[in-house]
Amino acid sequence: MGLLATIFGRRQAAAPPRRGVSRRLILRAGFDAAKTTDENRRHWAEADHLSADAAATPDVRRVLRARARYEAANNSYAKGIVATLANDCVGTGPRLQVLTDDADANAAIEAEFAAWAKAVDLPGKLRTMRMAKAVDGEAFALLTTNPEIASAVLLDLRLVEADQVTTPSLRLPSLASESAVDGIEFDDFGNPTFYHVLRAHPGSLFGLPTAEFDRVPASGMVHVFRVDRPGQSRGVPEITPALTLFAQLRRYTLAVLGAAETAADFAGILYTDAPAAGEADSIEPMDTVELESRALVTMPAGWKMGQVDAKQPSTTYGEFKREILNEIARCLNMPFNVAAGNSASYNYASGRLDHQTYFKAIRVERSEFECRVLDRILNEWLREASRALDLVPAALRDAMTVPHAWFWDGHEHVDPAKEATAQSTRLASHTTTLAAEYARMGLDWEDQIRQRAKE
């Protein structure tokens, strides 16, 4: 063994790592953002570990709603951004296309649904819901029966503000429940079962707010909001990250305007280069003299007239507004020129590129409305219509819904000639279909082909 060990060498047991070295290696493999230093301590002071619902308590959401509504009501940019978002998302409203094998039944259902949507002003209510989603954080619509509707189907949507969907008893620990989150009851699988709707708005002008509420089944309530975190039950305003920026924009504009007005208020100032008790005539300090237009003015001996150098608005004022508006619009996936209503600094290519991201966000938003709002409305409408009008084919009456698709307004191209050429190329190369091309414009290809045949 001694000879073999000498020839081949003897394996030596590896020495255990020193604790100090191992610890240094762990520290080197850490994350800089996880370290707390004297420099970043104040920046991360408000970071917490709260759940989505614990962070968005009723009081927090109430404050955010009030401030978001205040900015939307008093800030022209905020109002325009929210209104533009609703107009671009909903437009003139969605149009239904039924896809069963019965062409006559399809046409009848589509016509009746379009007439009902016009009778209840469905596009207008959807636009209001989209604005409420941006400003209030969520939108609610009760599926009710309205006997005054000029339609055989009496289904209607009654919009309810987020303030009115709450449970006053949740503020009492003895009545709180883990399966309930302010205004909503959930089952064991996380599905909403009931909504608590106050009988009077908390901010109503007609009497004092009441704590009485109705338990509305989830089947009769449409609730839409942007889910940013797992386990989130209620929505917060989509413009929340921009609220402080809106305030800064208005404060800066008022400060610039105030400085310019202050400088313009003084037509001129008398000053002298003579020393104190010098040869200049003595005049009353802080005295004011009204000047006449197009008149010659004589100065006291030794005195000169000068004007205040108006430095406001500064050359950086416009740049500041552009940067802050760009940051404001980013939380809504909206490009600067859409938020500002000004494309002066854009060229053709940059405008197209910015709008690609925006239009993709609009498609996602429309898909969410189809899934969470329109499909539920359609299913309820079909149930009512099958009883009132007998429109649904017998083979589909027991189904949960009918095959269908939704069409929305298309987006106008900046250069229609180029778009028409590209469309012809796609059709000639068989990389698209008439259905897809008409869908881009928000049109039903079958209706358009029939119309072309008539012409």
List the model feature ranges, each with a label.
Residues 69-227, 426:
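Structured, mid-chain assembly/scaffold modules that mediate subunit interfaces
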Residues 99-110, 297-415:
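Surface-exposed loop-to-helix/strand elements on domain peripheries
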Residues 190, 328, 437:
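Acidic/polar, glycine-anchored loop/turn motif associated with catalytic or activation segments
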Residues 113, 325, 434:
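Generic structural marker for isolated residues within well-ordered, non-membrane alpha-helices
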Residues 221-353, 395-397:
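Extended, charged amphipathic alpha-helical segments
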Residues 1-94:
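N-terminal-proximal low-complexity accessory segments that begin disordered
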Residues 413-455:
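Charged substrate- and nucleic-acid-binding regions of tRNA-handling and nucleotidyl-transfer enzymes
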Residues 128-129, 144, 259-267, 339-343, ...:
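Short coil/turn segments at secondary-structure boundaries
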